Design a protein with these regions (language model features):
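Acidic, low-complexity intrinsically disordered regions
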Residues: 1-100
Length: 100
């Protein structure tokens, strides 16, 4: 049984840089698996990392969190990405669907 962590639209940047933004809560859950993780993106197996980036897009400094993997570049902008931990407890499973 998989554990759904979050759903969010695929950004226009993901296809260019292979980074899919995730919430701080999802990042904390994934970092518990290790900073380098097995990733399954719409059925394509890859290795990825969980990383943060400092940001000043708001008046107070903060961080944005990402899953980074080459397979993420195949995700289509505007689709909804559901990020889960697969039933094996160690693979990050990202599946995209058309928006509702």
């Amino acid at each position: 049984m998989s554990e759904v962590l979050e759903r969010r639209p695929v950004s226009r940047k993901t296809a260019r840089d292979g980074k899919h933004e995730i919430s701080a809560g999802t990042a904390a859950r994934l970092v518990a698996l290790g900073t380098s993780v097995d990733v399954l993106v719409d059925g394509i197996a890859d290795r990825g990392t969980v990383a943060s980036m400092p940001c000043t897009c708001r008046p107070e400094a903060h961080e944005h969190w990402f899953i980074e993997a080459p397979a993420l570049r195949a995700m289509e902008v505007g689709r909804v990405a559901t990020t889960s931990i697969a039933g094996d407890g160690r693979t990050v499973d990202i599946r995209t669907t058309a928006p509702r």
